[in-house]
């Protein structure tokens, strides 16, 4: 996965002129070389989209590690950044964790549709996903995920409901937990607030914004199979 993502990034900054702008008259820049062959192959574009997501789940330095997720509320669209925890390509599932008391989960309870956005500036590639959410609270998946969660991260679920008003700047944590990890007994109280959000991907919109080899493609899931088509960028 790392090699795939790194190679795509290389195509974004390839063969620049001495002035710092792309030299459109440079034959080597215009040819379909090893860095740009994938831009002419839908199956490789699809593989690249999944590589970006998988890399995001496994590497905290990846720009796809913190995608934006948009939901719908009574006041209109709401968007926030989440931490991508798991990608299952075979099942077309993305997973991240959330507080059941927060607006994101509340909104998904009312309307499970969600949009996901991620952008890799080095690779000059954007992903937009259309998804439907399933919420896992208190079940086997939630429990196994909670048990594998870093104790420091569990502190997030030991605070008042997200968005609660405060008279002063606050983390929401009790003073003893401000500077240390909670014990297993202490963190256990947060499990009731813990939720795993599983997003079933129904469509992937992939956009590569290279100055010369600009490309866009969409992949839609139909009867368990992905169908891809080129789009005008």
What is each residue range found by the language model?
Residues 2-16, 22-233:
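Binding-site signature for planar aromatic cofactors or substrates
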């Amino acid at each position: 996965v790392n090699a795939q993502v790194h190679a795509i990034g290389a195509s974004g900054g390839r063969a620049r002129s001495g002035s710092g702008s792309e030299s459109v008259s440079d034959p080597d820049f215009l040819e379909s070389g090893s860095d740009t062959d994938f831009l002419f192959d839908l199956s490789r574009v699809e593989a690249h989209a999944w590589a970006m997501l998988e890399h995001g789940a496994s590497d905290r330095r990846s720009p796809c590690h913190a995608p934006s997720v948009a939901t719908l509320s009574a006041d209109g669209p709401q968007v926030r950044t989440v931490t991508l925890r798991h990608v299952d390509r075979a099942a077309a599932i993305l997973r991240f964790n959330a507080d059941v008391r927060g607006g994101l989960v509340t909104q998904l309870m009312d309307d499970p549709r969600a949009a996901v956005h991620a952008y890799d500036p080095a690779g000059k590639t954007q992903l937009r996903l259309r998804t439907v959410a399933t919420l896992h609270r208190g079940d086997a998946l939630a429990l196994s995920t909670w048990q594998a969660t870093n104790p420091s991260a569990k502190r997030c679920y030991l605070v008042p409901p997200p968005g609660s008003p405060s008279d002063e700047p606050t983390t929401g944590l009790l003073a003893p937990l401000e500077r240390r990890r909670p014990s297993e007994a202490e963190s256990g109280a947060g499990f009731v607030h813990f939720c795993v959000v599983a997003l079933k991907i129904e469509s992937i919109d992939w956009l590569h914004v290279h100055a010369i080899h600009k490309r866009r493609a969409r992949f839609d899931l139909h009867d368990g199979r992905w169908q891809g088509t080129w789009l005008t960028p």
